[in-house]
A protein has these predicted regions:
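A motif-centric feature for acidic-aromatic and gly/ser/thr-rich catalytic loops and repeats
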Residues: 128, 132-197, 204, 228-233
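A structural motif specific to WD40 beta-propellers
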Residues: 209-211
Length: 323
């Protein structure tokens, strides 16, 4: 469940497996028609095979057996990737119709266009890129989303600000220089989608364009939904969200053990559904408060006045929100 069928003037259609097949303006009825029509074609394994744009131009993709994307074809150009485990290492472009006599690895054009991506060890956070023999450092926010890039001389060459869904609010410098959105997402300007390993994410829709392949095991009731709060959660595989500090949260983690404070039994914990406050003042006065997506101030407003002033409670809530 949870698929988006209408978004303002945009309408969406899906196949029997829940994959988005069309997105267009208008109702699709005879007099109204389908304007600015995007079409999506899927492989049997649930991976996106092709996107047909409103201008009729096609974008095609290929993958390896692990779901890692190997190529993106658009017009006369093919973009290819080599991987280092779960992150891309090399990226380069080729002519779509190359000669069998060419050394497809060593043409001058490919050498100049080759990009090397470097990531934090055992993470999806990009820290640097090397292109045309020049190195650039990449700065990220608290979640690992790239925000700025600098050359070896310390000059800012790129910066970007995203909204909560991953849409670009502002971008300066070499636009598109760093294509990564949230952790594990590579944005394709040709389609407006972000490749997220096992699914594609749409910033405009604020959701995935196919259902979670692991269904409710992904811990989100909306099978198309991204994480509930992009300020501290991410989903690098398109399967299940992670805390940016501690990875997967499968079991309940107690931040503030149950104790009596001003005649209230209170406990603060984090589980697979996010941070919670358990508040109990006796029979029929028990509350479970999900504070996912709240600020510390908003979470404190959910409590009685006498508890808001307790420093231990405020500190526990802050730690839970930033877990």
């Amino acid at each position: 469940g949870g698929r988006l069928e209408q978004d303002g003037e945009w309408h969406c259609e899906y196949d029997g497996d829940g994959n988005l097949t069309e997105r267009y303006l208008g109702t699709g009825k005879w007099l109204d028609g389908k304007k600015d029509r995007w079409r999506y074609r899927w492989n049997a394994d649930g991976s996106l095979a092709k996107v047909v744009r409103p201008d009729k131009r096609e974008v095609e993709f290929t993958y390896d057996a692990l779901g890692r994307r190997l190529s993106k074809s658009f017009g006369t150009t093919v973009t290819r990737w080599m991987w280092n485990g779960n992150v891309p290492l090399h990226q380069w472009k080729q002519r779509r119709e190359y000669s069998v006599m060419e050394d497809r690895w060593n043409t001058d054009t490919e050498r100049r266009d080759m990009t090397v991506w470097l990531f934090d060890e055992e993470s999806f956070v990009p820290v640097a890129m090397i292109k045309e023999g020049r190195s650039y450092s990449i700065l990220t926010d608290q979640l690992g989303t790239p925000t700025e890039a600098y050359d070896a001389e310390g000059n800012e060459v790129w910066s970007r600000v995203l909204d909560m869904d991953g849409n670009v609010i502002e971008e300066t410098g070499n636009k598109g220089m760093v294509p990564f959105l949230f952790q594990g997402q590579y944005y394709d300007c040709e389609t407006g989608l972000a490749y997220n390993r096992f699914r594609y994410y749409s910033p405009k829709m604020g959701m995935y364009v196919s259902q979670d392949p692991i269904r409710l095991t992904g811990r989100i009731l909306n099978l198309y939904g991204y994480v509930c709060n992009t300020t501290y959660l991410c989903d690098p595989f398109g399967l299940v969200y992670q805390s940016h500090n501690h990875g997967d949260v499968n079991d309940s983690v107690t931040i503030l053990r149950r104790q009596n404070i001003r005649n209230y039994q209170i406990e603060v914990h984090v589980d697979s559904h996010g941070p919670h406050i358990h508040l109990d003042r006796g029979t029929r006065q028990e509350r479970y408060i999900n504070i996912s997506g709240m600020s510390n101030e908003q979470a404190l407003r959910e409590l009685p006045n006498k508890l808001r002033r307790e420093s231990s409670v405020s500190a526990a809530i802050n730690n839970a929100l930033n877990y």
